[in-house]
Amino acid sequence: MAKVRDVIDAMEQWAPVSLAEPWDNVGLITGNTENNIESVIVALEVTEETMAFALGNRVQLIVSHHPTIFKPLKTLTDSNLSSSIIRMAVKEDIALYTSHTNLDQVPHGVSMSLAEKLGLTNITPLAPGNCELLKFITFTPPEYTDRIREAAGNAGAGVIGEYNLCSFTSRGTGTYIPSSDASPHEGESGKLSRFTEDRLEMVVPAPLISKVIEETRKVHPYEEMAYDLIPMSRKELSLGYGAVGNLQEPMELPQFLGLVSESLQVKTLNVSKGEMRRIKLVAVMGGSGKDYIPAAVSAGADVFVTGDLGHHDFLEYCSSILLVDATHRATELPILSTIKERLHLSPLLEGLEIIIDWGKTVQTAYEYNEKGI
């Protein structure tokens, strides 16, 4: 039977908590990682309705995108929604887990799921995230190189764009003198040993380096594994906020708005006034994206689809880019299906029931409003 920690491991192999912004509150909020679970709810946020369903159906874990505790709680009473939910979760031993700004940045995360829902192609991040890259270098007997490369790669090393297990290997001579207390792979205590070694180099996103080192140690033959970590000047290009991609075929504005409405099942779209243009390059940001409008303009996008836009956003950028506010909620909902798909990929979660909480019913009728001058 799956445990809470198995779901956490699956989520954090995809969206490590170390990617989250410093102000964010992610990870396990309540619960015991060793508890057995038969089912899990995936939701944008934990509401009273979510908790009621969990209690009525004996669900032991809820994975949400929005943190249940965002601001510090000074009391645990029924005076507000967050503290009421936390009290209930602790009382009923329901684990609450959150993946927020870390999930925003990863491949197939919040914005990329939105882009995929709209059928975009050649999708890349709109703006860089906060993930630094390291060069991981270790030294090994040649006969161990392949298994070490595989172990490091399985932990997240060696990913460059759409290519996995990227590495460079060079051969040379290593030396060492084992002490009397050492147990060397080869050589004798007190004598200088010279052996042929491979130098294996792989890039690693900084949040994954501890896991890469841990998994490499498990297969490395040396008692003391030598390795170097070198900071790189560029950031991990596959990680970032927002997404930008192409429509398969250019569309006129009314056709594109129909696509957005139908794909996201959102009734009302707020759209900036401006010249009617053909849409080809589309930028998106799941949730609140007004801070990334300049990035969408810089990317040369014809349109930016996001949520939480205000009057002054439409006013300021009406001549620069077409803005479409499809609501915070609707632009984030596609991630729920992606989370379910990712959890199903874990062999440790085979047989686990994964229930999506879509929240309030989304209207499918279509209207759009224009905002701007």
Regions found by a protein language model. Give the residues of each.
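Hydrophobic structural segments
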Residues: M1-I373
